[in-house]
A protein has these predicted regions:
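Extracellular, repeat-based ectodomains that mediate carbohydrate processing or recognition
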Residues: 1-110
Length: 110
């Protein structure tokens, strides 16, 4: 196994998804992350990329701010990422005050 994330803590990273950009072979991972949490269950969304076949990984938090999910609303399966010709499109759900919202970002390597 190869470690993808940069986290040295014992916090949770979960519901990971990944894709390979067929145009250049770059690897792209997306997951929920609690490594920077200031309160219990505070969650961010992290994108990790490798442009050298998995020898090195670069990590970036892409959520605008952390959120704290509630046990009453399931949100985890609704996360995905696509990559085509250096254009990366992650999609995820976050919860704010018990309301789910769908988010995306426009990430470009070119």
């Amino acid at each position: 196994p190869i470690r993808v994330n940069q986290d040295k803590t014992k916090t949770h990273q979960f519901m990971s998804t990944f894709t390979i950009d067929q145009s250049d072979g770059s690897l792209h991972f997306l997951f929920y992350d609690r490594s920077t949490a200031k309160q219990p269950n505070e969650t961010q969304v992290v994108w990790v990329k490798s442009q050298d076949g998995g020898k090195r990984f670069e990590q970036q938090c892409i959520s605008t701010k952390p959120f704290v999910p509630t046990a009453k609303i399931f949100f985890g399966d609704y996360i995905s990422i696509a990559a085509v010709k250096g254009h990366i499109v992650p999609v995820w759900v976050r919860l704010d005050q018990g309301r789910a919202s769908l988010w995306t970002a426009n990430l470009n390597l070119k």
